[in-house]
């Protein structure tokens, strides 16, 4: 995977940790700009307008220390978020993180990983004998920066040694070769977000191809991990059924007889997300016509535009029928 970043900003305290010093060594003697923050405040990322600020933020890696060690909950997919990375290097036009990362949404690696995992251990102890599940990709895609941090590898090993814990994350990236030989003890699930080639080309900028994601899922399974696919967001456009069936068939050609879990997520958007997207991607082709959708209040107190009842029924019937057709041992966790 090519380097995605134009600049790296190190919090001074990050250099007190072995991971911080190791990451610095990796960027020394390269053409990537290195800066330092004495206070931990991240400044100096250029941007004359909202669009430029967004893209320059995406091209910035921050190496810092996680100060707040209490974990956020992550229901229904897990008990807690595991805050090893925040922000995402991908530039998916539809992403809900577009409204959560500020005007300059940089990627941050937290180098005090031992402290974070120790805190995870406290949560595990409190919930014993129940299993505690941690989600590593709630506010990030951690795979693009794994080459610098090794944090996923260490987390997988940590949870693999604890019978009362499980770890899971999802990615749009295929660069998982360094995780294949990790001692995971079948405690980690690595899922892949997939979509039609049309959607990937138009909206999922700076991510791996569909073919590479499927190949990586195959390699993950062969290394003993559990895996699955998030198909989403599902868009209803001309010939959508044909293209999504081709997507499922392509995955089936490689994984049709494997145990997989599917999560199907239809496209939805909020007014604030739409306004942000139109500023950053003024020529976007995203279907965001309020009149063509149903308005629905969400659990967090704000409303979103979703497909109506008839469209959702069509989506559910399509994916249930075709997943059952192309996959022998697949389960569908949800279709929303």
UniProtKB/Swiss-Prot annotation:
Binding site for [4Fe-4S] cluster: 88, 92, 95
DNA-binding residue intervals: 215-232
Cell wall biogenesis/degradation listed as a keyword: no
Catalyzed reactions: (5R)-5,6-dihydro-5-(thymidin-7-yl)thymidine in DNA = a thymidine dimer in DNA
Keywords noted in UniProt: 4Fe-4S, DNA damage, DNA repair, DNA-binding, Iron, Iron-sulfur, Lyase, Metal-binding, S-adenosyl-L-methionine, Sporulation
GO biological process: DNA repair; sporulation resulting in formation of a cellular spore
Cofactor, how bound (note): Binds 1 [4Fe-4S] cluster per subunit. The cluster is coordinated with 3 cysteines and an exchangeable S-adenosyl-L-methionine. Binds 1 S-adenosyl-L-methionine per subunit.
E.C. designation(s): 4.1.99.14
Gene Ontology molecular-function annotations: 4 iron, 4 sulfur cluster binding; DNA binding; DNA photolyase activity; iron-sulfur cluster binding; metal ion binding; S-adenosyl-L-methionine binding
Cellular component, GO annotation: endospore-forming forespore
Cofactor list: [4Fe-4S] cluster; S-adenosyl-L-methionine
RNA-binding is among the record's keywords: no
Residues covered by the Radical SAM core domain: 74-305
InterPro entries registered for this protein in UniProt: rSAM, SPL, SPL_Clostridia, SPL_firmicutes
Coiled-coil residue spans: none
NCBIfam families noted in UniProt: photo_TT_lyase
Protein family according to the UniProt entry: Belongs to the radical SAM superfamily. SPL family.
Biological role: Involved in repair of UV radiation-induced DNA damage during spore germination. Can repair thymine dimer 5-thyminyl-5,6-dihydrothymine (known as spore photoproduct (SP)) by in situ monomerization of SP to two thymines.
Subunit structure: Monomer or homodimer.
Annotated protein name in UniProt: Spore photoproduct lyase
């Amino acid at each position: 995977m090519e380097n995605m970043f134009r600049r790296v900003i190190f919090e001074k305290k990050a250099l007190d940790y072995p991971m911080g010093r190791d990451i610095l060594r990796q960027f020394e003697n390269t053409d990537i700009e290195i800066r330092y923050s004495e206070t931990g405040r991240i400044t100096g990322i250029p941007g004359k307008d909202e669009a430029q600020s967004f893209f320059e933020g995406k091209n910035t890696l921050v190496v810092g220390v996680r100060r707040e060690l209490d974990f956020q909950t992550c229901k229904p997919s897990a008990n807690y978020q595991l805050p090893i990375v925040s922000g995402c290097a991908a530039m998916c036009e539809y992403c809900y993180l577009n409204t959560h990362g500020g005007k300059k949404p940089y990627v941050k690696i937290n180098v005090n990983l031992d402290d974070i995992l120790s805190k995870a251990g406290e949560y595990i102890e409190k919930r014993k004998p129940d299993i505690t599940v941690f989600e590593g990709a709630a506010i990030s895609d951690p795979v693009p920066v794994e080459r610098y941090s090794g944090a996923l590898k260490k987390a997988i090993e940590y949870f693999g040694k604890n019978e009362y814990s499980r770890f899971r994350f999802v990615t749009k990236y295929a660069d998982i070769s360094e995780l294949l030989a990790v001692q995971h003890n079948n405690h980690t699930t690595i899922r892949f977000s997939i979509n039609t080639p049309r959607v990937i080309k138009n909206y999922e900028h700076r991510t791996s191809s569909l073919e590479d994601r499927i190949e990586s899922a195959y390699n993950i399974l062969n290394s003993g991990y559990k895996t699955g696919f998030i198909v989403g967001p599902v868009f209803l456009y001309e010939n959508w059924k044909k293209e999504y069936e081709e997507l499922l068939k392509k995955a089936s050609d490689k994984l049709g007889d494997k145990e997989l879990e599917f999560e199907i997520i239809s496209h939805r958007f909020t007014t604030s997300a739409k306004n942000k997207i139109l500023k950053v991607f003024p020529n976007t082709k995203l279907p965001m016509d309020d009149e063509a959708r149903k308005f629905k209040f969400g659990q967090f107190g704000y409303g979103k535009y979703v497909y109506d009842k008839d469209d959702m029924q069509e989506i559910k019937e399509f994916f249930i029928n075709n997943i059952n057709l192309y996959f022998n041992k697949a389960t569908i966790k949800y279709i929303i």
